[in-house]
Curated annotation (Swiss-Prot):
<keyword id="KW-0813">Transport</keyword>
<keyword id="KW-0851">Voltage-gated channel</keyword>
<feature type="disulfide bond" description="Interchain (between alpha-2-2 and delta-2 chains)">
    <location>
        <begin position="443"/>
        <end position="1098"/>
    </location>
</feature>
<dbReference type="GO" id="GO:0040014">
    <property type="term" value="P:regulation of multicellular organism growth"/>
</dbReference>
<comment type="subunit">
    <text>Dimer formed of alpha-2-2 and delta-2 chains; disulfide-linked. Voltage-dependent calcium channels are multisubunit complexes, consisting of alpha-1 (CACNA1), alpha-2 (CACNA2D), beta (CACNB) and delta (CACNA2D) subunits in a 1:1:1:1 ratio.</text>
</comment>
<feature type="glycosylation site" description="N-linked (GlcNAc...) asparagine">
    <location>
        <position position="540"/>
    </location>
</feature>
<feature type="domain" description="Cache">
    <location>
        <begin position="485"/>
        <end position="574"/>
    </location>
</feature>
<dbReference type="GO" id="GO:0005245">
    <property type="term" value="F:voltage-gated calcium channel activity"/>
</dbReference>
<dbReference type="Pfam" id="PF08473">
    <property type="entry name" value="VGCC_alpha2"/>
</dbReference>
<dbReference type="Pfam" id="PF08399">
    <property type="entry name" value="VWA_N"/>
</dbReference>
<dbReference type="GO" id="GO:0060024">
    <property type="term" value="P:rhythmic synaptic transmission"/>
</dbReference>
<dbReference type="Pfam" id="PF00092">
    <property type="entry name" value="VWA"/>
</dbReference>
<feature type="domain" description="VWFA">
    <location>
        <begin position="291"/>
        <end position="469"/>
    </location>
</feature>
<feature type="glycosylation site" description="N-linked (GlcNAc...) asparagine">
    <location>
        <position position="386"/>
    </location>
</feature>
<dbReference type="GO" id="GO:0098696">
    <property type="term" value="P:regulation of neurotransmitter receptor localization to postsynaptic specialization membrane"/>
</dbReference>
<dbReference type="GO" id="GO:0007528">
    <property type="term" value="P:neuromuscular junction development"/>
</dbReference>
<feature type="binding site">
    <location>
        <position position="297"/>
    </location>
    <ligand>
        <name>a divalent metal cation</name>
    </ligand>
</feature>
Length: 1150
């Protein structure tokens, strides 16, 4: 229906409104001038000249309510809520019940400093046991290898071992090893399920995993398998001394992984790309931190195919860097320039590497080769001392197709005679250039020369530079034998999130008497520690729902934190969540983080913002932070406590009860946990905690309660297999909440006050909902510590309203079944002497429809419940929320901006929505007037639905597709470029999953598997305005008056506004829901990097280093039979099988 045009001085349409000029009317804007469609609300005092008109004699019956009227309505609402909560909530009665049962519990104190020091000491002891096991393994490995005698004629059948991939290959009839019949040397094992490993294992053997692109029958690999077999006895002895050990792993520099206990490899659906040398823990243990500049030749001589190889090579090179490293990437021809927005070295973290990888794809070949420009740029980058960097190994990695210039003058100026910067050169592609200059550059600067003729050589040749960096470490001997602990990452064998202690293993052999000692690293020894094992050392339930322990490393990344919950993990990358991203960042937390990284002790009480568990709300709270370093590690431990969690209750079942040797099920209060009592005492949900070792967990609370009761039939109160603190507190709270039913709830008529349920939840893990039938619609988490209403009630004074949550699809609520309710809860504060604590939360569940009607009555001018106000034609009345709901909008909105109640019947099914989705203009006005403020943050642990592939029907990414004319051109087929392309096509088809998808696709196809992504979150919370406030939403003829006032002792805002009668003033909506984001602008973030410290040890130089071994190529000699068969397979459309390649260099002879 069209809206009638409005004119200045005219009354608003409709019979019920008083005649008055429209706010905002005045002289008509001149030609070419446009009145703004919306603007900030104006305070009502600006309209004082108009107020006489609002009540002019002879006007229509109703006017916009006065401020004192709306304040009166607000007081009535406050009194009604307070009255219901006093009668049914039972806060005071529950306090009395606790005091009446004072003999059944003790009040214990959390002493932050003692507590955090104890936990830090326990973690130190745990890790120290792993360190001792690591040292035994590393020493044994070095001795075994030193005693080993190299065998040139060793054969596969001479070596017996368990091939971890054998079972998967036997199940695959097309496997290369099945075809070659080489299983004679492979053991077949039986396995048993072990919950500690989340896997089936065999404790009598270790397993061996060899990368797909390494030929397991090569002499180097067979000798490696031969001498590492002796490690199995050391693995077993370590486990005998420490049964809690998890995976013990030796990652060899040849690519062989031997791990204990044996378990079948988790083979992916595509080609298995696992190579231990590319794992974060191996890279960290094999070398010291790096400052790396990658320079890429993009001159015109770099053909399309060669440039594609370079791009892929750079991306693979970036994957060998960790968060302790710094990097920049530049392209060069006549000039050098960075490929991205980064103008200096930046930390090689996941997000920065992503920027590089995307920027590298945009490189274009043109111009002429200018090595001098590229090297001068790289040396300038490394000499820049005004930025944060690793300050250890310095290196330049140059990718080129070849050239004649040796740029000796550049090296003389920047690097000689000390040669502090290593130069690694990479000849990329098939070409006829003289590679002598590239070899000379590498050899003259303590580096190495590599060849990458085709795609299959990329992985091996972009990681072997680590051998060179490991030389000073090997030559340093015992000084370099220091255990390092990694970032958090995802275990490849399914253990979940782990950290790994690493220790390098050195080659102690000498070529002969008086000869120089060997300077090759043999590999890295590693022992995993599951994060869950560390968490078990921290207090779980004595800190309360909002207290927690956290730990960070030298990068500020969290090792422990309740918000460390990655929804997906990238197999190839560590899980790096900064402490300031795990919480809402502020200056106080920056200071705490810096102090922890510096290894200091400290304590600080701060006011800070916290995000609710459901991520819909923000609360400003007080928190006490206490922190200490964990000795012998790079970690620091912190403890966070709210002031009300300084004390906690500990059940003290009397001697008489404990002397009863009958099962716990015979104790008095236990009967109130039985379902048979629910009808009279209300339904009980128990938190799914680890009360006893033999208790079977279940996501279904009814099933869990059943399991719990069955176990209690067998367990006595002092059983050693149970956690007495948890168990006794559960039974104590069962009895206390039952007394609340008996004293308060049972004798009250909930229907009188339109209540669907009353409830109580406790620190002890009990949630009691009354009456029993209300449990059918109870959707809150049975673990109070994981329930948003529980945690928010503890942090807020007064009554916390929680409307039903509506999902992002904006489906309306279903009101037909009369079970949609609004939770109102409050914490029970208990004072015992001078000790104050909050051991429980109580509340009610309001019937939405009934309370919406009640809301209209309370916000009306009725003088009696059943007597509406009367206004004659000559009398003046103010509009109210009941009689004038067609003209007046009245709502209650909570502190997050979500609709709680409305006087508009059509809005009842929108309760729980963000109010901007209900009335965008009004919500914007509230925000602009500081009733609400906004907090934006990023969730770096989100999971997003898979994006539809953008290259369906195309050739594998990075592969050049020749034209028909090329195929018909004989000269093209005989050229070196054609041969190079053919190799590229073959290896691209065989191994293209290296570049198409992440190896983690083992668990699902890319079409169905969620991927890690960044989501931008926006939450709203109450601003600085506490008083009653009147304003106008100025929008010309669509202007609206509104009034807003906070309700005392609640998290509600009472808003009264004129309803909009036209839509021409639609303003931009405030958004609250999560949105997909690229995160903050990385180019800006690197200009103000967060504080961090690198490892305190650095091995980048040793005067005895032998740099004569400085270069060789690695190409794959083609087999005519293989190539012909692969071509036939391609023509027939059959998928080719990868052929074994010897990717272990001769220098690896051990």
């Amino acid at each position: 229906m069209a809206v009638p045009a409005r004119t200045c001085g005219a009354s608003r349409p409709g019979p019920a409104r008083t005649a008055r000029p429209w706010p905002g009317c005045g002289p008509h804007p001149g030609p070419g001038t446009r009145r703004p469609t919306s603007g900030p609300p104006r305070p009502l005092w600006l309209l004082l000249p108009l107020l006489p008109l609002l009540a002019a004699p002879g006007a229509s019956a109703y006017s916009f309510p006065q401020q004192h009227t709306m304040q009166h309505w607000a007081r009535r609402l406050e009194q009604e809520v307070d009255g219901v909560m006093r009668i049914f909530g039972g806060v005071q009665q529950l306090r009395e019940i606790y005091k009446d049962n004072r003999n059944l519990f003790e009040v214990q104190e959390n002493e932050p400093q003692k507590l955090v020091e104890k936990v830090a000491g326990d973690i130190e002891s745990l890790l120290d046991r792993k360190v001792q096991a690591l040292k035994r393994l590393a020493d044994a490995a070095e001795n075994f290898q030193k005693a080993h005698r190299w065998q040139d004629n060793i054969k596969e059948e001479d070596i017996v071992y368990y091939d971890a991939k054998a079972d998967a290959e036997l199940d695959d009839p097309e496997s290369e090893d099945v075809e070659r019949g080489s299983k004679a040397s492979t053991l077949r094992l039986d396995f048993i399920e072990d919950p500690n490993f989340k896997n089936k294992v065999n404790y009598s053997y270790a397993a061996v995993q060899i990368p797909t692109d390494i030929y397991k029958g090569s002499t180097v690999i067979l000798n490696e398998l031969n001498w590492t077999e002796a490690l199995e006895n050391v693995f077993m002895e370590n486990r005998r001394q420490d049964p809690t050990l998890l995976w013990q792993v030796f990652g060899s520099a040849t690519g062989v992984t031997r791990y204990y206990p044996a378990t079948p490899w988790r083979a992916p659906k595509k080609i298995d790309l696992y190579d231990v040398r590319r794992r974060p823990w191996y890279i960290q243990g094999a070398s010291s931190p790096k400052d790396m500049v990658i320079i890429v030749d993009v001159s015109g001589s770099v053909s399309g195919l060669t440039l594609k190889l370079m791009k892929t090579s750079v991306c693979e090179m970036l994957d060998t860097l960790s968060d302790d490293d710094y990097v920049n990437v530049a392209s060069f021809n006549e000039k050098a320039q960075p490929v991205s927005c980064f103008t200096h070295l930046v930390q090689a973290n996941v997000r920065n590497k992503k920027v590089f990888k995307e920027a590298v794809q945009g490189m274009v070949a043109k111009g002429t080769t200018g090595y001098k420009a590229g090297f001068e740029y790289a040396f300038d980058q490394l000499q820049n001392s005004n930025i944060t960097r690793a300050n250890c190994n310095k290196m330049i990695m140059m990718f080129t197709d070849g050239g004649e210039d040796r740029v000796q003058d550049v090296f003389e100026k920047y690097n000689w005679p000390n040669r502090t910067v290593r130069v690694f050169t990479f000849s990329v592609g098939q070409h006829n250039y003289d590679v002598t200059p590239l070899q000379w550059m590498a050899c003259a600067n303590k580096g190495y020369y590599f060849e990458i003729p085709s795609i299959g050589a990329i992985r091996i040749n972009t990681q072997e530079y680590l051998d060179v960096l490991g030389r000073p470490m090997v030559l340093a001997g015992k000084e370099a034998k220091q255990v390092q602990w990694t970032n958090v990452y995802e275990d490849a064998l399914g253990l979940g999130l782990v950290v790994t202690g690493t220790l390098p293993v050195f080659n102690l052999t000498q070529d002969g008497p008086g000869e120089k000692k060997n300077q090759l690293i043999l590999g890295v020894m590693g022992i995993d520690v599951a994060l869950n094992d560390i968490k078990r050392l921290t207090p779980n339930y004595t800190l309360g729902a909002n207290g927690y322990v956290f730990a960070i490393d030298l990068n500020g990344y969290v090792l422990l934190h309740p918000n460390l919950k990655p929804q997906t993990t990238n197999f190839r990358e560590p899980v790096t969540l900064d402490f300031l991203d795990a919480e809402l960042e502020d200056e106080n937390k920056e200071e705490i983080r810096r102090s922890m990284i510096d290894g200091n002790k400290g304590h600080k009480q701060i006011r800070t913002l916290v995000k609710s568990l459901d991520e819909r709300y923000i609360d400003e709270v007080t928190r006490n932070y206490t922190w200490v370093p964990i000795r012998s590690t790079n970690y620091s431990l912190g403890l966070v406590l709210p002031p009300y969690s300084t004390f906690y209750l500990q059940a003290n079942l009397s001697d008489q009860i404990l002397q009863v040797k009958l099962p716990i099920s015979k104790l008095k209060d236990f009967e109130f946990l039985l379902p048979s009592s629910f009808e009279s005492e209300g339904h009980v949900f128990i938190a799914p905690r680890e009360y006893c070792k033999d208790l079977n967990a279940s996501d279904n609370n009814t099933e869990f309660l059943k399991n719990f009761i069955e176990l209690m039939e067998k367990v006595t109160p002092d059983s050693k297999q149970c956690n007495n603190f948890l168990l006794h507190n559960l039974i104590l709270d069962t009895g206390i909440t039952q007394q609340l039913v008996e004293r308060v709830w049972r004798d009250q008529d909930l229907n009188t006050y339109s209540l669907l349920a009353v409830f109580a939840a406790t620190d002890g893990g009990i949630t009691r909902v009354f009456p029993n039938k209300a449990a059918e619609d109870w959707t809150e988490n049975p673990e109070p510590f994981n329930a948003s209403f529980y945690r928010r009630s503890l942090d807020n004074h007064g009554y916390v309203f929680k409307p039903p949550h509506q999902d992002a699809l904006l489906r309306p609520l279903e009101l037909e079944n009369d079970t949609v309710g609004i939770l109102v809860s409050t914490a029970v504060e208990l004072s015992l002497g001078r000790r104050t604590l909050r051991p429980a939360v109580v509340g009610v569940k309001l019937d939405l429809e009934a309370w919406a009607e009640k809301f209209k009555v309370l916000a009306s001018n009725r003088t009696h419940q059943d007597q509406p106000q009367k206004c004659g034609p000559n009398s003046h009345c103010e509009m109210d929320c009941e009689v004038n709901n067609e003209d007046l909008l009245c709502v209650l909105i909570d502190d997050g901006g979500f609709l709680v109640l409305s006087n508009q019947n059509h809005q009842w099914d929108q309760v729980g929505r963000f109010f901007s989705e209900v009335d965008a203009n009004l919500m914007l006005a509230l925000y602009n007037n500081s009733f609400y403020t906004r907090k934006e943050s990023y969730d770096y642990q989100a999971a997003c639905a898979p994006q539809p592939p953008g290259n369906l029907g195309a050739a594998p990414r990075g592969v050049f597709v020749p034209t028909v004319a090329d195929f018909l051109n004989l000269a093209w087929w005989t050229s070196a470029a054609a041969w190079s392309l053919f190799q590229q096509l073959l290896y691209g088809l065989i191994y293209h999953s290296w570049f198409q998808a992440d190896p983690a696709e083992a668990e699902g196809s890319p079409e169905t598997r969620e991927s890690s992504c960044v989501m931008k979150q926006t939450q709203y919370y109450f601003g600085s305005v506490n008083a009653s406030y009147n304003a106008i939403i100025d929008c010309g003829n669509c202007s609206r008056l509104f009034h807003a006032q906070r309700l005392t002792n609640t998290n509600l805002l009472f808003v009264v506004a004129e309803k909009p009668l036209c839509s021409q003033c639609e303003a931009g909506r405030l958004l609250q829901k999560e949105t997909h984001s690229d995160g903050p602008e990385q180019c800006e973030l690197v200009q103000r990097p967060r504080y961090r410290r690198g490892p305190h040890i650095c091995f980048d130089y040793n005067a005895t280093e032998d740099t004569s071994d400085c270069g060789r190529g690695a190409s794959f000699p083609p087999s005519l039979g293989v190539l012909v068969s692969l071509q036939l397979l391609l023509l027939l459309g059959l998928p080719p099988r990868p052929q074994p390649q010897v990717l272990v260099h001769a220098s690896r002879r051990l």
